[in-house]
UniProtKB/Swiss-Prot annotation:
Residue ranges of the motif Required for optimal activity: 295-297
Protein name, entry field: EGF domain-specific O-linked N-acetylglucosamine transferase
Gene name for this UniProt entry: Eogt
Alphabetical keyword list: Endoplasmic reticulum, Glycoprotein, Glycosyltransferase, Signal, Transferase
One GO process term, biological-process aspect: protein O-GlcNAcylation via threonine
Length: 527
């Protein structure tokens, strides 16, 4: 039985305990549902994909007259793409490739497959295929440790963590924070295999520094009462990127979502522990987003200082700056776009944060201009551009400045998600494109010679992207003045030719009106 459990974990068939499981009770009240379906909190479109990977829930639903998802029982072939039983035609969407990048491959089919593996659910499949057991249990009460290659993702049971003798300083990711015996479990450890996974040892790329000292203990931490604190709930450990920058912080959230897929569990009845070896706090301008992943406040690791803490189940999440990871360090084949992963992430977060689509509006295109109140990359003739937009009766124009002290993040998301054309200068605020509707267009007014960043993010999300094309019609205030690098295009402000600006916006509008998911086709001729 134990070996079946081990193999089930490796084959992605066993979710975190208590997660998404159906428990029909013999003594339940007559007339009650057999399962708490409301606890799923998934977008309707995701339900058949969830049921595919959770056949026990599907079986209960089939027998339960109260199940609201019976219509999805006919679509159980639908799958995300990483499941072993998943066929390409049943996947949650497929990338679209318009040409072959001969530097990578030589056919459209192979380009599509490569893009899917680089940045879609194929990435999850490759991580799942890498998973191996590093510390093997020999009985049901033993600990365990399994990880993907380079210890980029790990999952542990019966984890022992001794924080009685740690020393904190200013370093958020101190590599010698734990000493021998400070972390481990009661299981048979393959130490040679574990220490051979250190090729990508780096704070935000691997858990190697934290787990290289994992010790085979001679006691069962929980059963032998060796813990000051026993954490019963499944716990996700995360090393976080900059919480004040949306681009970097959403690398955290995207990788947490991908980790949930690898775990086959989307429950919010979990703890999230921020692995931070400093004594500092963490500034988080996007903290509302955690509500999509947990019912509880994020816990700083220092909360457990001076204690021996044991975790029944722990997950070491995929990290935000992994080499060839998502999405900070992602090398992408050109010519392809539209990943199911990023679209699913967008839908998942919006659904759980209760952000709804209130349009589109009949006879209107909702245009949002993201202004900047920072020192650099301001639009110097912004009023002139806005007035030009207002001459088009079809455009409903809104200028916003996403300053967190004046506009909460959830309100920012509501504006973004109810935008058809999103316009802004190069900067982290353009990460909002992740939450535009599928038919929308994003116009990076000027990319400041950083050509790939938001172009690639738009490709991943499947959103139409344009940027300024004619250097002779954009006018920098000066050559830019970075404090250490000298002249730099990101460190100045810009004016733009109004006629060229309008030409590009109308090009974006044309795309929106022709998009197959745009529901108001009659507006095309009016524009």
């Amino acid at each position: 039985m134990l070996m079946l459990l081990v193999f089930g974990v490796l084959l992605h068939e066993v979710p975190l305990s208590g997660q998404d499981e159906a428990h029909p009770e013999a003594d339940r009240v007559p007339g009650e549902a057999l399962y708490d379906y409301s606890s799923l909190r998934l977008p309707e479109e995701h339900i058949p994909f969830f049921l595919h990977s959770n056949r026990h829930v599907a079986s209960v639903c089939r027998e339960d007259s109260h199940c609201p998802y019976k219509k999805h029982l006919e679509s159980l072939n639908s799958c995300w793409g990483y499941e072993k039983s998943c066929t390409p035609e049943s996947r949650f969407g497929s990338p679209i490739c318009s040409y072959v990048d001969l530097g990578w491959t030589d056919t459209l089919e192979s380009a599509q497959d490569m893009f899917w593996k680089q940045a879609d659910f194929g990435y999850a499949r490759e991580r799942l295929e890498e998973i191996r057991m590093f510390c093997r249990p020999e009985s049901a009460s033993d600990s365990s440790l399994l990880c993907s290659r380079y210890l980029q993702y790990c999952r542990a049971t019966g984890l022992y963590l001794d924080l009685r003798n740690i020393k904190r300083n200013h370093d958020r990711f101190k590599e010698d924070f734990l000493q021998g015996g400070d972390i481990g479990g009661y299981c048979k450890l393959d130490r040679h295999a574990l220490v051979s996974e250190g090729q990508r040892k780096s704070p935000l790329q691997s858990w190697f520094a934290e787990l290289q000292g994992y010790t085979q203990l001679n006691f069962r931490p929980i059963e032998d009462a060796k813990c000051d604190i026993v954490v019963e709930k499944p716990t996700y450990f995360m090393k976080l990127d900059a919480g004040i920058n949306m681009y970097h912080h959403f690398c955290d959230f995207l990788n947490l979502y991908l980790t949930q897929h690898i775990n086959n569990s989307f429950s919010t009845d979990v703890y999230i522990v921020m692995w931070d070896t400093s004594s500092y706090g963490y500034g988080d301008l996007f903290s509302d987003t955690w509500k999509a992943f947990t019912d509880y406040d994020v816990i700083h690791l220092k909360t457990y200082d001076s204690k021996k803490v044991c975790f029944k189940e722990a997950v070491f999440s995929l990290l935000p700056r992994m080499r060839y990871g998502l999405f900070y360090n992602t090398p992408l084949i050109s010519g392809c776009q539209n990943t199911g992963l990023f679209r699913a992430f967008s839908q998942h977060v919006l659904h759980r944060l209760n952000i709804s689509q209130e349009g589109p509006k009949d006879g209107k295109l909702r245009v949002t201009i993201l202004a900047r109140s920072t020192e650099y990359r301001k639009i110097l003739n912004q009023n002139e551009l806005v007035n030009a937009l207002k001459t088009v009766s079809t455009f409903e124009v809104r200028v916003v400045d996403y300053k967190y002290r004046e506009l909460g993040f959830l309100d920012q998301l509501r504006i973004t998600h109810n935008t058809d054309i999103f316009i802004g200068m190069h900067g982290a605020g353009l990460t909002h494109l992740l939450f535009l509707p599928d038919w929308a267009a994003v116009f990076e007014l000027y990319n400041c010679e950083d050509e790939r960043c938001y172009l690639d993010l738009a490709r991943l999300r499947g959103i139409y992207y344009i940027t300024w094309q004619k250097p002779s019609k954009v006018f920098p205030q000066d050559k830019g003045h970075h404090p250490t690098l000298g002249e730099h295009p990101k460190f100045t402000n810009y004016s733009f030719d109004v006629e060229e600006f309008m030409y590009l916006v109308l090009q974006a509008a044309e795309h929106v009106l022709q998009h197959p998911q745009w529901p108001l086709k009659k507006n095309h001729d009016e524009l």
